[in-house]
């Protein structure tokens, strides 16, 4: 009977969720409006996602995530350019207010003008299949220049890979690795 009780609980939750979602969405819009009025640059249109491009506010996504973490708020994703927070009615109003207070308490600084490196132009040495099945090793990105990538290198799945299996790692790829915090990569032996 445990499974039936679980199904009953899930059905109750789903029946209640629509109402709680309809009540929660305007609160999220209010939070987004407060953040925008405070000077945060918000991007995207997903109603339950708060996506901040914080460089115009003087922080990297990683830096703003660290500040929010001090208040017990953990981002879904952050990198040098973005911070993403996933919101849900299950978080409750207290969490939204805690997030609002934490964001509005962050002191605005001079904008950060550093931008991400250009997107690499791939130079192929092997087909992806050949590269995947070739003997490989993991090395620091500082030693990867000129080597052939043995595995897709991405900062946070699901993301666009910086280098795909079979591509030659050039200076642009190395700069992107470093910018996005990738310290090691797989290369063909």
Spell out what each predicted region is.
Residues 41-42, 73-78, 148-158:
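Short, flexible, solvent-exposed loop/turn segments with mixed acidic/basic and small polar residues
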